[in-house]
Amino acid sequence: MPTINQLVRKGREDKVVKSKSPALQKGYNSFKKSQTNQSSPQKRGVCTRVGTMTPKKPNSALRKYARVRLTNGIEVTAYIGGIGHNLQEHSVVLVRGGRVKDLPGVRYHIVRGALDTAGVNNRKQGRSKYGTKRPKPGQAAAKK
């Protein structure tokens, strides 16, 4: 426990909280050609590479990912959720934060149903997370 005199001399130091999605914390000023501290919830980017990778030890799959160059100039690896996708090189995508636990180095997700990314087809539940429009009432009965 510090004395009052020690607190007056030094004071309390704030904890430094490290961001889990640092690329979204930086903006870019194209006029000054410099980075800014303007953070945002999502950022637009262009796919530079689309591929699959295998997850960490107990799991086994081919997880889809895209390497994305964001508008602030930073290049990140983002996960493509859902079954099937239409992304290829030069596709414009919207990237949000959120890591994938079993893929090392993947700290971002691609938002389905935004910009060039199509929503997941034939999705009935949890549609908002996969950018799927609401099915028409007559269509659901006809498919069964």
Swiss-Prot record:
GO terms for cellular component: small ribosomal subunit. Disulfide bonds: none annotated. Belongs to the universal ribosomal protein uS12 family. It comes from Brevibacillus brevis (strain 47 / JCM 6285 / NBRC 100599). The keyword S-adenosyl-L-methionine does not apply. The modification 3-methylthioaspartic acid is found at D102. GO terms for biological process: translation. It comes from the Bacteria. CDD domains: Ribosomal_S12. HAMAP family: Ribosomal_uS12_B (MF_00403_B). This is Small ribosomal subunit protein uS12. Residues 124-144 have a biased composition (Basic residues). Residues 27-42 have a biased composition (Polar residues). The lineage of its organism: Bacteria, Bacillati, Bacillota, Bacilli, Bacillales. Residues 1-55, 119-144 are annotated as: Disordered. Part of the 30S ribosomal subunit. Contacts proteins S8 and S17. May interact with IF1 in the 30S initiation complex. The gene is rpsL. NCBIfam families: rpsL_bact (TIGR00981). InterPro entries: NA-bd_OB-fold, Ribosomal_uS12, Ribosomal_uS12_bac. Keywords: Methylation, Ribonucleoprotein, Ribosomal protein, RNA-binding, rRNA-binding, tRNA-binding. Pfam families: Ribosom_S12_S23 (PF00164). With S4 and S5 plays an important role in translational accuracy. Interacts with and stabilizes bases of the 16S rRNA that are involved in tRNA selection in the A site and with the mRNA backbone. Located at the interface of the 30S and 50S subunits, it traverses the body of the 30S subunit contacting proteins on the other side and probably holding the rRNA structure together. The combined cluster of proteins S8, S12 and S17 appears to hold together the shoulder and platform of the 30S subunit. The keyword Transmembrane does not apply. One of its GO terms (molecular function) is tRNA binding.
